Structures are given as C-alpha cells and as structure tokens.
C-alpha cells in the first residue's frame, strides 16, 4: 500500500509543475509568438473601433494567386504555420487573419456575431490589401465562414477549399439542445490545458498525441489564464451561439466555384454534442457520411478523404494533407 501511495504522490508531484507552467497570455494573445510577422487592420464595425491581426506572406517566386486561410474555433492564424510555409514555397501569396473575437484580434464586450459579419470583415481586409480575387481555404469553423464568404462574394472567390469543416450538418435540427450564451460562458470559464488536450487528442488527432501539439494547447489555455480571461470566455460563448444558430449546410447547392473537400474520416466534431441525449449523440459527427453528403450537395465538388486522420489533418499529417491541397489547387490552372 505504501508503495502505491508513494507512486501516486510522485505522479501528482510530476503533474503539478505542468499545471503551474501554463503561461498567462493577454486577451489578444499578448506574449505568444506565431513565428511570423503580424500586421493589424484597424477599422470600425458596429460603432466600435476594432483591430484584426493578420499574417501576409509573399512568395519569392509568385504564381499570381492569393490564398486566404480561415482558422477554426479553437485555432488561430498561427496554427496555419506549416500550411503557410507550404503555400508560400509553392508560389502563393498567403493571408491568414485572426477573426474578430479570436486570438490576437479585438475581443469586444458586445458584438452581433454572424458569419456574414466576419465575411464582411475579411472582405474589408482583402480590399485594403488590394486583393481582388482569392482562393479561400477554411478549416473547422473556418469552413463555415469560407462557405458564407463564397456565397456572399462568388465573383471574388476563384476556388473554395474546406478542411474538415464543421457545419456539414445542422446540430439544432438533429436534436442538440440549445444553450444560452450565459451557459456557454460558464462552460468556457472552466477551460484548462488539461481539458483542451483531452478534447484535442480524442477529436483532432484520432487518439494520438505528439509533443509538437502542446504548443497549440498552451496557446489556447494561456488566454484563459490571463487577466482578460473573462473577455476571452465571453467572446467564445458568443461565437458558439453563432455556430449553433447559423447553419450553412442548406445553401451548399448555391456554391458556384470549384470546391475541394479534404476530410479526415476519424473526426467526430459536433459542437454541443455532449449536451445531447445519447441516442442523438450517436448520429452526430459522422464525417465519412457527412463528407460524401457535402460533395453530393455542392455542384463542383471534389472530395479527398483520409481514413486515419482526425479533425486537424493539416497538423496531424501535414505532408499528406498538403500534397492533396496543392494537387487540388493546381487542378484549377
């Protein structure tokens, strides 16, 4: 018994420093370095001054095309790191913004979040940068935003790419119960490095974990450790409400541009699934079926699947994902 107690005490002692070492970042990710120069777009929206952080990378040998990378709910412009390098080296200009409410961008006390508003913000940034036409790539929640952007600005979207997008189903219609913004807020205040890592390991990486994933856990957890954690949690709650209440799946048939779907079939993401009855949970996040359904609904879609990958294939298996991505982009030429 004493040996068991000693081992348990040792495990606790080893775990404690890891918890204590979670850094405290500012509400706009002050203190966390993406490893890329970050610029800021200052503009006014909904009677408030805002700043949108973004990365703008120019290639040494440009091929004349621009790609816009739209991050997911638990991701930032910086998590596109390997994708940024790959596309730059292939000749693309690459622009990766942090949306309002996320990461290094403004987190307002009050904001009427909608995918339309985020698309308009992104379009304003591209206008400021002189980009008249782009290929839009969205991952996770960024896939819903990319869809909305393409629907609103079809003539300026030469190609649409979605990497494990959420929103391939309507969770509300399938039986996921509504949660108030206040409930989401209380839930988000409990966010920790441990909860993030557990969720990401199960959902993003199909049960696997590599040391390089820890950087992205630290990035997210650090915002919930700092002095502005309430503002971070509040904006996160508002964004979850947007995601739940604003489906895009019913408009897939209106997409006019060539669309590439890159799907890790081990993904099981479905926001709010844990609050749904067990019989409903079983029907959600079936990405093998959802990917096929989306490809059938979108007029000019190409579907590429990865049977062993989860929600973040560009991080889990970057070489494989990026080969499929570059092949899909080259097919437009």
Where do the model's predicted regions map?
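Flexible "cap/lid" loop of the alpha/beta hydrolase fold
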Residues: 147, 151, 158-191
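N-terminal signal peptide c-region/cleavage motif recognized by signal peptidases
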Residues: 15-17
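Catalytic active-site module of serine/aspartate enzymes centered on a nucleophile-bearing elbow/loop
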Residues: 288-333
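Conserved HGGG/HGGXW glycine-rich cap/lid loop of the alpha/beta-hydrolase fold
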Residues: 46, 50-104
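Active-site loop/oxyanion-hole signature of alpha/beta-hydrolase fold enzymes
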Residues: 44-48, 55-61, 99-137, 141
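Conserved alpha/beta-hydrolase catalytic His-Asp/Glu region
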Residues: 191-253
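N-terminal cap/lid segment of alpha/beta-hydrolase-fold proteins
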Residues: 27-57
């Amino acid at each position: 018994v004493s040996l068991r107690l000693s081992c348990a005490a040792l495990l606790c002692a080893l775990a404690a420093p890891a918890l204590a070492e979670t850094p405290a970042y500012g509400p706009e990710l002050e203190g966390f370095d993406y490893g890329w120069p970050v610029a800021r777009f200052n503009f006014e929206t909904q009677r408030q001054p805002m700043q949108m952080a973004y990365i703008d990378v120019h290639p040494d040998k440009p091929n004349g095309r621009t790609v816009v990378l739209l991050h997911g709910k638990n991701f930032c412009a910086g998590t596109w790191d390997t994708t940024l390098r790959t596309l730059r080296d292939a000749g693309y200009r690459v622009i990766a913004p942090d949306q309002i409410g996320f990461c290094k961008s403004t987190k307002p006390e009050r904001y009427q979040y909608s995918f339309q508003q985020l698309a308009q913000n992104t379009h304003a940034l591209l206008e400021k940068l002189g980009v008249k036409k782009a290929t839009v790539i969205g991952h996770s929640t960024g896939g819903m935003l990319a869809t909305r952007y393409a629907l609103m600005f079809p003539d300026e979207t030469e190609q649409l790419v979605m990497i494990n997008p959420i929103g391939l189903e309507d969770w509300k219609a399938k039986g996921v119960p509504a949660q108030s913004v206040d409930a989401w807020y209380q839930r988000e205040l409990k966010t920790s490095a441990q909860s993030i890592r557990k969720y990401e390991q199960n959902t993003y990486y199909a049960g696997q974990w590599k040391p390089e994933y820890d950087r992205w856990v630290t990035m997210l957890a650090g915002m919930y450790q700092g002095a502005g954690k309430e503002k971070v949690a509040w904006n996160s709650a508002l964004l979850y409400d947007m995601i739940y209440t604003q489906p895009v799946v019913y408009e897939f048939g209106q997409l006019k541009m060539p669309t590439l779907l890159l799907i890790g079939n081990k993904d099981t993401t479905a926001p709010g699934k844990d609050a749904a009855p067990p019989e409903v949970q079983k029907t959600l996040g079936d990405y093998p079926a959802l990917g096929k359904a989306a490809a059938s609904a979108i007029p000019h879609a190409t579907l590429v699947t990865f049977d062993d990958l989860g929600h973040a294939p560009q991080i889990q298996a970057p070489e494989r994902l990026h080969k499929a991505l570059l092949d899909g982009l080259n097919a437009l030429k």
